[in-house]
Structure formats: structure tokens, C-alpha cells
Amino acid sequence: MLAAIFGLSGPVLTADERAFFRDADPAGYILFGRNVVDRAHLRALTDDLRALHGRDRLFICIDQEGGRVARMKPPVWAAYPPQGQFDRLYDLAPASAIEAARANAEALGLDLAEVGITVDCLPLLDVRQPGADDVIGDRALGGEPLRVAALGRAVLDGLARAGVTGVVKHVPGHGRAGADSHKALPTVTASAAELATDLAPFRSLSQAKIAMTAHVRYTAWDDTAPATLSARVIADVVRGAIGFDGLLLSDDLDMAALTGSIAERAARAQAAGCDLALNCWARMDDMVGIAAALAPMGAATAARIDRALADTDIAPARADARRSDLTARRDALLALLP
């Protein structure tokens, strides 16, 4: 198995993709709006991917957060609120906010499970800081670590109840970055003591099964490389101070925060300690280069993948009725907001 997650170019596999994926055997896939038509189509696509690899439990992920980050959209799928709504509700009624976040995540997870998606890149555990770039903004669960951890745990629990594994991101924290890492490399100059705030939610949820790295440079830890490419940050901070021993996924290697060829980025991420290299844009030359650049997957990474997918369920019972009940409960709680 190749230690990579690849994107697909369109709503069905091309002949070239099918041949390449069969031979390369990537650990999994990430889906975007370009891959999505409707429920029947999306289930057929994910079933095709499972059949191609002969793996019933296949890592198939998506960024389905709610708000401005949603790949599955109305009118086929329901709209979900941005995660920041639960932060706002927490100001008024913390227990209600936690319940609403859990119900929302379970309903959203049912949408994913019934079309064969096993992993959602949610929740964000980034602690939002004043003056940061708005790339996180209302996607965040708040600006206070205990709150972010409590709501993040509720999101993970809700997704798990639906048979979907959540991904905590962007470790070790994107909440104070002054630039959008899609466009440039953010450099955070906060001290190690100040960064304890950023680490706190990740430490609280260090037993999460999957985490995604931040393409952010933290001068207090390593002023030479962003976290994704820093062996020091991954060993000392992610695996060390945070205590995370789950599956570590890079953020998209095609983002402008990183330099070098895509293959070089993948090799550097793996050498730094990322279990899986994420490449979203389905450019065949890049994917072939990544396959050639990556070292064979180690036993520890393979075991982490197995643990991450062990409780996934792509045949949720009573999905429609459960989703209706869950969204009604969420909406009743969010109605408390002024």
C-alpha cells in the first residue's frame, strides 16, 4: 500500500486513473465537489474504489465541515451551519452547544456514511486568535482551549456514532496564523509558552484516530520548515508534547505554503514523520511522481490506518429517520441564539 491519499479528476475514474490506482494501491482518496453528482452516483463511485482495491474499509475522505466548506451541497444534501455557530451557542449555554455540535456531526456523518465515505476532515481544533487570517475564522470552534476541546470531542463523538472517523486539524494549531497557507507560508513567532494555548485542545483529544498537519512555521520550535515538513515539530510537539499516536495526514501538498516539486514535498513530509501524504488535485504526473518518491509504508502506519477505519460503517441503519431527528434537535438548540 502506498502512503498517499489522492484526489480524483472527475465524477468517474478515467481509464488512466483506474490503471494507476490499481498498480500504485494508495492508502485512500479525497473527494471534492468535482467528484459529486448525487447520492446514487457518489455511492457507486466509492463502491468502485473499494472494489478496485478489494478493501471493504477504505480510507475515503472529504472536507465536509458545514458553512463555507462543503463539497456535498444543496439541493441534493442539506446545508449545515458553520462550526462557529456552536461557539456562539456555548457563550449562552455550554451543555446545549455540546449537544447541538454532537447532533449536527452525527447527522452530517450519516450523509457521508450512506454514500460510502469513511473519513471527514473535521473538527478544527485551531484556537482562533485575534488578528489571524480569516482562512480559519468561523470554521473554528472558538478562541478558548477548553471550549474548543469540549466541542471538538462532541464532533468526533457525533461522527463516530454515524460510522465515520473524524480528523482533528490543523496540528499543532493554525489559529494564530497571519496568512492563508493555501496562498503563502504563515510564520508564527509566538513563544513556546504562548503556543501552549494552541496545543491544549490537541492534547485533550490526543486519542483521536487521525490528525492533519498545519503548513505553518513556528519559530519557537523550528524556524527552518513548516510543521508538515519538520521532523522536530512532529517528533517533539505532535508525538511528544501533544502525545498523539494516531494516523498523521499531511495537509494538501499542493498548497503555496510549501516549495519544491510535489514529489519532493511528499518525500519530505514522509521523512519528517507524516504517515500519509495528501495530494488533492489529481494531476497524473504529480501522482506518479509521489508514488516514485515515497518510501514503502511501514508497519506502524499500516496499523494506524487499520485502527482509524476499524469502526467505520458504510451501511448506517435508519439513516433518514435518525438524520431528521438529529437536525431537529440541533435546530431547536441553535434557536436559542439571538
Where do the model's predicted regions map?
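Preference for extracellular/luminal or secreted protein segments
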Residues: 1-24, 260-338
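N-terminal small/glycine-rich loop or linker at the start of catalytic domains
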Residues: 1-3, 65-91, 125-137, 166-187, ...
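N-terminal hydrophobic targeting/anchoring segments and the immediately downstream early-domain regions
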Residues: 1-60, 66-76, 338
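Divalent metal-dependent hydrolysis catalytic cores, especially in the metallo-beta-lactamase
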Residues: 28-34, 118-124, 274-277
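Glycine-rich tight-turn/loop motif centered on a GG-T
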Residues: 34-35, 78-98, 132-151, 179-196, ...
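Second-shell residues forming the walls of enzyme active-site clefts
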Residues: 35-52, 58, 70, 153-154, ...
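Charge-biased, low-complexity intrinsically disordered regions
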Residues: 41-51, 107-108, 117, 320
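Glycine-rich, aromatic-flanked loop segments that form ligand/cofactor-binding clefts
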Residues: 53-81, 101-128, 148, 156-172
